[in-house]
């Protein structure tokens, strides 16, 4: 069901071991993965030091953008839930000193956006 959810744009939880293996080349020594979510090919990872956003691009997904955001740099975030006619939810994250959100992720109508919001709140506050 996780594969189907991913295709539909729903975020699904992935194991911390899987996320750690995926990010082995960029994790610091002693840095622990606390939670991870997969959205189609993208990954949102919460470590004990930072938020890591992996954006796999292109047809094959070989080109990858990795954003590393220290929690202390996150000034605010917002969650816009899906409505009756608007089927997408949206997560926005602002970085200190920025007027526009540095991160904007779209989710299909599902409950996983609340889990991601809860993890953000736990690490940023």
Language model features: what each stretch is:
Residues 37-60:
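Conserved beta-hairpin
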Residues 2-27, 36, 59-125:
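Acidic, Ser/Thr- and proline-rich intrinsically disordered linker/docking segments
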């Amino acid at each position: 069901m996780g594969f189907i959810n991913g295709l539909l744009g729903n975020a699904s939880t992935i194991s911390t071991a899987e996320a750690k293996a995926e990010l082995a080349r960029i994790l610091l020594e002693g840095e622990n993965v606390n939670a991870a979510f997969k959205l189609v090919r993208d990954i949102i990872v919460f470590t004990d030091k930072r938020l890591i956003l992996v954006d796999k691009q292109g047809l094959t997904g070989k080109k990858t953008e990795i954003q590393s955001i220290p929690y202390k740099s996150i000034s605010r975030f917002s969650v816009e839930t899906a409505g009756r006619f608007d089927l997408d939810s949206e997560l926005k994250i602002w970085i200190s000193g920025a007027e526009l959100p540095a991160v904007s992720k779209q989710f299909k109508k599902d409950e996983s956006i609340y889990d991601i919001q809860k993890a953000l709140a736990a690490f940023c506050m």
